Amino acid sequence: MASSAHSDSASADASAEIPAEILAPAPWSTPADDSEHLRITAVRTFLTAPQGCPYVIVRVETNQPGLYGLGCASDPQRTLAIRSVVDDYYAPMLLGRDPSDIEDLHRLLFNSGYWRGGSIGQNALAGVDVALWDIKGKVAGLPLHQLLGGRAREAADAYTHVDGDNAGEIAEKVLAAHERGYRHVRVQVSVPGTDTYGTAPRDAAEARRRELRAGSWDSLAYLRHVPPVLREIRERVGTGVELLHDAHERLTPSQARELVHEVEDARLFFLEDALAPEDAAHFDQLRAAGSVPLAVGELYHDVMMYLPLLQRQVIDFARIRIPTLGGLTPTRKLVAAVELFGARTAPHGPGDVSPVGMAANLGLDLSSPAFGVQEAATFREATREVFPGTPVPERGRFHGTGLPGLGVDFDEAAARKYPVPEPLRHDRWALLRNGDGSVQRP
C-alpha cells in the first residue's frame, strides 16, 4: 500500500533552509534573510483515502510557528502526477516567498510550465492556491467568505443524491431527503441492461461487473427509459422539492436535444452535463430545444471555457470544480462573470472533493450573489476524523463555521490509517464501452 503522507519528498527536504536568493523575486519583495517577514518554509503533500477515493492534500508551511494553510489538489484519476507537480516543480519555486502575494504566486506558477493548463497542472496549482488563501484568512482572523467580500446569504442550499430502479422507489427517497431538510435532490435512474451512471449496483455480481467494466452503455435504452421515470417522479413528489438529473456527458448532441424535449414536464431545477466539453458548440441548439435549465462545467479545466457559453446565455448554471480550475484565485473571477451574465453557480462537491475543497466551495457560496446550489457529499466518519471541522449540512444547508481561513484542519496521523491503494487504478471506472465495443465517455 502507498504511504498516506508524502512528507519525505524532495520538496520537504529542500525546505530545510530558505534559499538565500529567491529566483526572480517580485520587485516589492523584502530580502530573503529578513527573518521577521512572513515566508513560506515548506510545501508538503499528503495522500490519503478515508472516503475511498484518493485525496491529494497540500500543506504550505510558514516561518510563523503553527501558521500553515491547506489546499485540495484531488483528481482521483491522476493522483501521483499531481503530487509530483507540487513536490518537484511548485514547491522549490515557493520557498522563501511571501504567502500573502497570492495573485502574483498564482501567475508565477501557472506560467512556469509554459505549456499551460490541463487538469494535472491546474489541480496541483489549486492545492497551493487554496492553501495560500487559508493562510491569509488565518493571518487576518477572518473566515474565507469574509475575505471574498462578506456574506451574501445566511446559508448555502445543498443538494443530495438519490437513485433507484423505478419512480416509486426514487420518489420515496426524494421525499425522505426532503424530510431531512433538503430542498434540492439529484435523481438518477437505473436503466435495465446498461451500466448507468450515478446508481448503486443491485447486487455483488453487478458491483463486480461495474468494477471490471464488464457491462456496456446503451444511449437509446437510456432515452427510452429515463424521461418517463423522471416525469412520474415529479408527479409523485409534487412541486415542493427541486429535482436535478445528470446525463454525465454520455449523449450525442442530437440525443441531448431529444432528452431536453422529453424531460420538460419533469420541471427539473437543472439538467447536468447533457453535452461533453468537446460538444460545447452545440449548446445553442440545446437551448433552442426546450426551456430546461442547463448546467455544465465540472470537467472544465480553464475558466475561459465558460465564457462563450455565458456570453451566449446558453447555460443557466456553472458547475465549478475549484481544484480543476486552478484554485480560488481564478474561480472567484469566474464567479463574478457568472453573476454579470445572469447565470448561477453550482459547485462540484461529491466524495472526490475533500473537506478542504468543500470548505473552499463554501467561501464562494456564502459570498457570491450568483450562488445557486452546492452539491453535498456524505462524508464518512473516517473522513471527518482525518479532517477536523469537515463541513456538514444542517437541514440541507451549509452555514459555515466562522473560523479563520477555511476552518478545516488535517490530522496527519489519522490520514496514515487510510492509505491510498498501490498501484492506483481509480481510472478503471472510465473504461466504459458501447454495445458495439466502441469507447464511451464515462
UniProtKB/Swiss-Prot annotation:
UniProt keyword Transmembrane helix present: no
Catalysed conversion reaction: D-mannonate = 2-dehydro-3-deoxy-D-gluconate + H2O
Annotated positions binding substrate: H161, E298, R319, H348, D352, E375
Reported cofactor(s): Mg(2+)
Keywords: Lyase, Magnesium, Metal-binding
GO molecular function annotations of the record: magnesium ion binding; mannonate dehydratase activity
GO terms, biological process: amino acid catabolic process; carbohydrate catabolic process
UniProt KW Magnesium keyword: yes
SUPFAM superfamilies linked: Enolase C-terminal domain-like (SSF51604), Enolase N-terminal domain-like (SSF54826)
Job of this protein: Has low D-mannonate dehydratase activity (in vitro), suggesting that this is not a physiological substrate and that it has no significant role in D-mannonate degradation in vivo. Has no detectable activity with a panel of 70 other acid sugars (in vitro).
Protein name, entry field: D-galactonate dehydratase family member SSLG_02014
